[in-house]
Amino acid sequence: FPTRRSSDLARTESLYDTLFVTSDDEPGSYYPLVAENVRYADDFSWAEIAINPRARFHDGTPVSARDVAFTFHKFMTEGVPQFRLVYKGTTVKAIAPLTVRIELPEPNKENMLSLFSLPVMPESFWKNHKLSDPLSTPPLAGGPYRITDWRMGQYVIYSRVKDYWAATLPVNRGRWNFDTIRYDYYLDDNVAFEAFKAGAFDLRVENSAKNWATRYIGKNFAKGYIVKDEHKNESAQDTRWLAFNIQRPVFSDRRVREAITLAFDFEWMNKALFYGAYSRANSYFQNTEYAARDYPHADELVLLAPMKAELPPEVFTRVFEPPKSDGNGFDRDNLLKASKLLDDAGWVLKNRQRVNAQTGKPLSFELLIASGANDQWVLPFKKNLARLGVTMNIRQVDMAQLTNRKRSRDYDMMQTLWAAQPWPSSDLQISWASGYIDSSYNAPGVKSPVVDALIAKIVAAQGDKNKLLPLGRALDRVLTWNYYMLPMWYMGEDRVARWDKFSLPAVRPVYTLGFDTWWYDVNKAAKLPAERR
C-alpha cells in the first residue's frame, strides 16, 4: 500500500491497544478492549476503569493501571498542545494495580469518552524515550501488529502478532486478517499510480476525479486483475475548504472574503477539470441533519437573536449557498457582485489593479499549497481573481514546510480538509473557540464571542440531541455566513482500486473502508499472474 513519504507512519494505531474501541457503524459507542469494565458518574465527571488482567504487551508483561496513567501524563507533557489545553486540570491515577481513576475538572461527557480511546503505551519503554525522538528500533508495543522491517522514508512492514492477547475478544472477531502488511512511501503520486498499475502494491484510494475517469485503463483492468470499486458514502462527509487567515489584515474584512469566494468558479472547474465528480461543500456538517439547509427555526432564532448585532444579517434571512455559475468559464454576474463588495470594503480599481483607497497598497495575497498536490484549479482561480484586479501569488512547499507554516499560521490562504463530524461534539472547541486560537486546527484564526457562546452551549448539551440540533445548525449558519473559509468540494463516493485478491464482508461499515475486516482470498489470487498473487 502506498503513502506519501512525509505522511505520518501508516497503521501506527495497530501497534497499541486502546482502553475501549469505537464501532465503524455506531458513532458514540464504545466497547472494552484493554478495559474490562468501567463505572462512572452520571455527569461523566469521573470514571474508574478496570484493566483486563489478560492484557499484555508484546514482551509478555501485563498492562497495568500505571501504564495508563503514564501514557496520559506522557501526552500531557510531550504531546500536541491541543491535548494539554483540552485536558488541563484532568487527573489520571492508578488507584490499584488494575484500576485507573480519571477525574475531570468539570463534567464533560465528550472529554471523558475521548480518554476512553487513549492508546496504552508501556512505561517500561517510553520512560526512557521522548515522543519526539527518532527511534533506531521499533518501540515495544501491544496491539495486533508489530513492526518487523523498515527503511526510513521508503517502506515499513507490519507483521501480525501470533500470540496477540486480544485476538479472540468480541471486538476483534473478523479483524486483523493479514499476516503481513507493507506500506511503501512515494514522493510523487504519479509515480505511485504507475507503480500500482504495474503491480508494485495492492490497494489504492483515489482522490483525483480525473485520474479515476481517465487513467484506470490498460490490460490489467481489461482482464479484471484490478477492480475499480466505487460506492456512495452515506455518512458525514469530509469537505475541502480554502482557509482565509483572518488574522492577516488582507482578510480581516468579511466583504473581501465573500468577494474572493465569488471568484471561485466551482461549476466550471467541476465540469472542465473534475468530470463532474465533486459536489459543492455548503456546510461544516455536510450530509448530516445538523447542516443548516433550511431557514432558521424558532429554536435557532432564540439562540441567535441576542447576538444579532454581531452577526451578518443573512444568518436570519437566507439559507447559505455558495455562489453558482453557469459553468461557461466567465461568470460576469458573480464578478460584478465581487467587484461591488471590494469597492464597499475600500479596495478600488486603479489601472486594472485593486488598491486600498487610503494607502494605495495593492490587494494581493499568497496561496500556500503542497508540492505535488492536485492543483488544476489554482490557475483558473488566479485568472478569475485577476479579472477583479486581485493578485494571488502561488507558493508550493513540501509537506514538512506546509505543516510548520500551518502550525505557526504563516500563510494568507491555504487548503484544508474539514474532517466530518456526525454530530456537533466538544471537539469543535479546538477548531473554533477563542481559547484555542493557537491551535493549528483553527486554520482561519477565528476569535469570536458569538462562536464561543454557541460552542460552550454545545459542550454543555452533549448527549441531548434536542438541544444539539438547533445549536449545530445555528453554529453552521454563523460559520458559513462569516466566510471564514471558502467552500470547495467533497466527493460523495469512496473510490478504491485493488488487485483482485481480497474478499470483503457483505455489509460494509458506514464510517470507514473497513480494511481491517478484509482477508486474502486464495481462489481469487489464483486467477492473477503468478507474480501478483
Where are the language model's segments positioned?
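Detector for C-terminal structural segments
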Residues: A10, L104, L140, R151-V156, ...
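Aromatic- and charge-enriched surface segment that lines or borders ligand/interaction sites
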Residues: E36-P81, I95, R101-E103, Y186, ...
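Extracellular/periplasmic solute-recognition and catalytic clefts
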Residues: T91-A94, T148-S159, D184-R248, R255-A259, ...
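A structural "hinge/loop" feature
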Residues: F1-A10, Y31-E36, T61, P107, ...
